[in-house]
A protein has these predicted regions:
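Interface-prone segments of viral and bacterial extracellular assemblies
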Residues: 1-263
C-alpha cells in the first residue's frame, strides 16, 4: 500500500427518497449497488474542530449539475442531506469523510458553490427556558407530554388547486373556512414521493398568500393545515384544545413584587 494512493470521492445528496449521486472519477461507477455519475466537483479542505462553524464543506460544481435544478427559482423547504465518502484506489478501503446538510447555494457565471453545514446545524438547541406568559408558547400540533397534542389530520382541509401565481394559490375549498383560518399554517403536497411544503402568510376567500413561491400544477390536491394565533379563545373555539393551552391568560399585568405600595 502506498501513502500517496489516489482517492475516489463519492457524493450522495438525499432528499427523502430522492438521491443525486456523483463521483469524481472521470467515468460512471457503482458503489454499494448504487450508480454514481461523473461530476466535476472541487471541494474545500476538511476541518475537524470543536468550533462547529468551522466544520463546513464547500463544493464548487458546474451550474448544469442536475442537483441544482432544485434551487433554480426557489430553494426546497426540505433538508437535503449530503454525504462524502471516499475510496482508496490501491486497496479499495472506503471511509465516510463528511456528513451534513446543504445550507445554501451561491451562483456565479460558470459555477455554483454548494455550502454544506455540519449535522449539528439541524439539531434543536436548548434555547431559553419557558416563560410565564399569557399567550401559548407551544408548537401547534406538537405531540408529547405537556405539548399541544392537536391531531393535525383532524384539522386538514384537502383542496384542489385552480391556479398558482407567484406567492398566491387559489382553490375553492379554502372559501369553506372564514378568512384568516389558514393564517400561519401551511400547504403540503407530494411530487414523485417527495413532500413539498409552503408556509401560509394570509388567507382570504379562495386565495392563500404563501411565504415562498409554489409551482403546483393545476388540479393538484394539496393538504392545508390551519395556523394558530396562540390565544386561549382560538385554542378553545378553533381547535377544541383549551385543556392543553400552554399560557396563562389570567396572568396579572402588575408586578406584585414591584415598588408600588398598593397592589
Amino acid at each position: 500500500m502506498s501513502f500517496i494512493s489516489r482517492w475516489i470521492e463519492f457524493y450522495d445528496f438525499a432528499r427523502g427518497v430522492q438521491h443525486f449521486r456523483y463521483v469524481t472519477e472521470n467515468k460512471a461507477l457503482v458503489y454499494l449497488g448504487q450508480p454514481y455519475i461523473y461530476a466535476n466537483i472541487k471541494r474545500s479542505g476538511l476541518t475537524e474542530s470543536g468550533d462547529l462553524t468551522r466544520n463546513v464543506l464547500d463544493l464548487s460544481v458546474p451550474t448544469d449539475l442536475p442537483l441544482l435544478d432544485l434551487y433554480r427559482g426557489t430553494a426546497p423547504m426540505q433538508d437535503i442531506e449530503m454525504t462524502l465518502r471516499r475510496q482508496r484506489k490501491s486497496d479499495g478501503v472506503v471511509e465516510t469523510r463528511w456528513v451534513g446538510l446543504i445550507g445554501s447555494v451561491e451562483w456565479s457565471t460558470n459555477k455554483a458553490i454548494i455550502h454544506g453545514l455540519p449535522p449539528m446545524a439541524s439539531l434543536k438547541g436548548l434555547g431559553l427556558k419557558r416563560n410565564w406568559q399569557k399567550s401559548c408558547p407551544l408548537t401547534t400540533y406538537g405531540s408529547g407530554l405537556g405539548e399541544c397534542n392537536v391531531d393535525r389530520e383532524t384539522m386538514r382541509v384537502n383542496a384542489t388547486i385552480i391556479s398558482t401565481a407567484g406567492l398566491t394559490a387559489t382553490a375553492a375549498a379554502w372559501a369553506t373556512k372564514p378568512d384568516g383560518w389558514f393564517d400561519g399554517g401551511w400547504i403540503e403536497w407530494s411530487v414523485s414521493g417527495i413532500v413539498e411544503r409552503r408556509p401560509i402568510v394570509s388567507h382570504v376567500g379562495t386565495v392563500l398568500t404563501l411565504l415562498r413561491p409554489a409551482i403546483v400544477p393545476d388540479g393538484t390536491v394539496v393538504a392545508t393545515y390551519p395556523g394558530d394565533d396562540h390565544t386561549l379563545a382560538t385554542c378553545d373555539t378553533k381547535f377544541n384544545n383549551a385543556v392543553n393551552y400552554g399560557g396563562d391568560p389570567f396572568l396579572t399585568e402588575k408586578n406584585p413584587m414591584g415598588s408600588d405600595p398598593i397592589y
